[in-house]
Amino acid sequence: ENSLRLTANTGHIKYFVDRLWACWSEYVSHYSILDDVGHFHIRMIKLQKTLPGEGYHQWHFESDNMDRAGRIAAWGCYLNTVDQGGETEWLYQGIRIPSIQGNLVIWPAAFTHTHRGNPPLSGEKYLLTGWIEL
């Protein structure tokens, strides 16, 4: 597996987590029902490296079993720009978000947002990813 688990102990990771929470607050402002849910947390941050032609191409969603039922949302932060391929694609929304350095995407973890990572075609893809959980 081309991933690494990171903790929020270093300054750069803490800075990123603070920015992620700021984005989450903006997300919640659009879906006010989440105000009543309570505390959210980020259990882990994964750093993924995807080589050309690789990726997680299978359609999936993030809360697909009881162990993952506490996942409210998934997120991904693109660490580099991929010129061809490497998009995150959502099945039912019919959209593809390209891998552009610095972009952060947050989406519901439920089956309504079934998605996949398309393979990068023109170089490696680097991504921080994880979940907002109850």
Regions found by a protein language model. Name each.
Residues 1-104, 112-134:
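Fe(II)/2-oxoglutarate oxygenase catalytic core
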